[in-house]
Design a protein with these regions (language model features):
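A structural signal for well-ordered alpha-helical segments within the folded catalytic domains
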Residues: 25, 86-90, 195-203
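Short loop/helix-cap segments at secondary-structure boundaries that form the rim of catalytic
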Residues: 47-54, 123-129, 236
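N-terminal anchoring/stem segment of glycosyltransferases
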Residues: 1-83, 97, 101-106, 160-164, ...
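Short, polar loop motifs at secondary-structure junctions
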Residues: 41-49, 60, 117-124, 140, ...
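GT-A fold catalytic core of metal-dependent nucleotide-sugar glycosyltransferases
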Residues: 84-151, 155-163
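A residue-level signal for conserved active-site and pocket-lining positions in enzyme catalytic cores
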Residues: 31, 92, 116, 156, ...
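Short, hydrophobic beta-strand segments that form beta-sheet elements in well-ordered domains
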Residues: 36-45, 109-116, 134-135, 243
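Catalytic core and acceptor-binding pocket of nucleotide-sugar-dependent glycosyltransferases
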Residues: 161-273
Length: 273
């Protein structure tokens, strides 16, 4: 086993609305501080002049553009937020196939971190470097029935070989997410409200647990890797390695768009551990 801070990693995220651009920049600053040797790939959009939704992608070799294979227009409704979160599955499949080889010559290792996430120290997740692994915080509150336990996709690590079990899940997740971009909002079986990308991924990994070539599923501690702050005071949760500043509280519902959230960047940054 090795800690992830001792392994090559491609860390990625995107911001698909101008309101998220500064969030993405702030998140990446914390990654550079705590994991200066990781490869970083980011996207910002929408970019004008393309038929389908398009992001400008910043790679180590320069900039390029990636366009979704389906079209949608932001219309100011709640569905905007859900369409954008469904882009995550497609984005991760793009990263896996085009860029993940940067992480390791024979093993892809890609980590997603939401733009509103902030690292507070070096991540200490332990991985078997040659295993097929999906690692993420899970919501497993004792008061929640086991069938409703689910992935929290603000931070996800995918590790595996080309053509392996993890790649198979990524392909299906991307296809499901792309399909749901064009569907009306559907209820989630795990949380109140419509389902999003993490619901689709949870269903896939749960169905694959019985497969003979299944991957290892690491359920990381929710409070440590998905530290949700106090919404009233803005105080971060003690003992976290990732603070998640939950921009959905401002961006999901149209009536919340003018909400004074999250706190200013300088108020969110913590001393290095």
């Amino acid at each position: 086993m090795k800690r992830i801070d001792q392994l090559p990693v491609v860390l990625t995220s995107f911001a698909y609305r101008e309101e998220y651009f500064s969030e993405l920049d702030g998140m990446m600053a914390t990654v550079r501080e705590h994991h200066p040797n990781w490869h970083l790939i980011t996207g910002k959009g929408p970019v004008a002049g393309f038929e389908n939704p398009t992001l400008e992608v910043e790679l180590s070799a320069g900039k390029t553009h990636w366009s979704l294979p389906v079209s949608f227009q932001l219309d100011g409704t709640e569905q905007d937020w859900h369409r954008i979160v469904f882009m995550k599955g497609w984005w991760m499949a793009q990263i896996w196939h085009h860029c993940a080889v940067l992480a390791d010559g024979h093993r892809n290792r890609v980590m997603w971190l939401d733009a509103d996430g902030r690292l507070t120290g070096k991540l200490d997740v332990e991985l078997e470097p040659d295993a097929e692994v999906i690692a993420s915080p899970w919501w497993t509150d004792p008061g929640t029935p086991e069938p409703e336990h689910h992935i929290c996709s603000g931070m996800i690590i995918f590790q595996g070989a080309r053509g392996g079990a993890v790649e198979s899940i990524l392909k299906r997740w991307a296809a499901d997410c792309i399909a749901h971009i064009q569907l009306p909002l559907l209820p989630s079986p795990f949380v109140p409200g419509p389902q999003g990308d993490q619901c689709l991924l949870t269903k896939l990994v749960k169905s694959d647990l019985a497969a003979p070539d299944k991957c290892t599923l690491l359920k990381l501690d929710y409070d440590k890797y998905c530290g949700v702050p106090d919404y009233k005071t803005g105080a971060p949760k003690p003992g976290t390695l990732i603070d998640q500043w939950m921009m959905n509280e401002k961006m999901r519902l149209p009536e919340d768009r003018n909400r004074n959230w999250p706190p200013p960047e300088e108020a969110r940054r913590r001393p290095s551990k």
